[in-house]
From Swiss-Prot:
InterPro entries, sorted: Signal_recog_particle_SRP19, SRP19, SRP19-like_sf, SRP19_arc-type
Functional summary from the UniProt entry: Involved in targeting and insertion of nascent membrane proteins into the cytoplasmic membrane. Binds directly to 7S RNA and mediates binding of the 54 kDa subunit of the SRP.
Quaternary structure annotation from Swiss-Prot or TrEMBL: Part of the signal recognition particle protein translocation system, which is composed of SRP and FtsY. Archaeal SRP consists of a 7S RNA molecule of 300 nucleotides and two protein subunits: SRP54 and SRP19.
Matches recorded under SUPFAM superfamilies: SRP19
Protein name: Signal recognition particle 19 kDa protein
GO molecular function: 7S RNA binding
Main subcellular location: cytoplasm
One Gene Ontology cellular component: signal recognition particle
One GO BP annotation of this record: SRP-dependent cotranslational protein targeting to membrane, signal sequence recognition
Organism, as annotated: Halobacterium salinarum (strain ATCC 700922 / JCM 11081 / NRC-1) (Halobacterium halobium)
Domain of life where this protein originates: Archaea
Gene name tied to this protein: srp19
UniProt similarity note: Belongs to the SRP19 family.
Amino acid sequence: MVENVIWPAYFDAALSRRDGRRVPMELAVEEPSIDEIATAVQQVGYDAVVERDVAYPRRHWDAAGRVLVKDADDAKNTLVQAVAAYVGALRD
């Protein structure tokens, strides 16, 4: 079973690529929540499991949580880009 981990830092417009952002600034949002990300993952068509009390290793002081994506067929980068597009659409 393939399990991808998606951290809110991947979509945070306040972070640089060096600090963990994985999407272009055009797709990034301010302070993404794991609930928004989980909703976007479900919109893309995958099952999402939210873990709230874990911290992204590069930001170990900020336990923002993470979203686990079960059985994703796509490459992780493709999945992250699709989720970023939906998170942006949810904000509009």
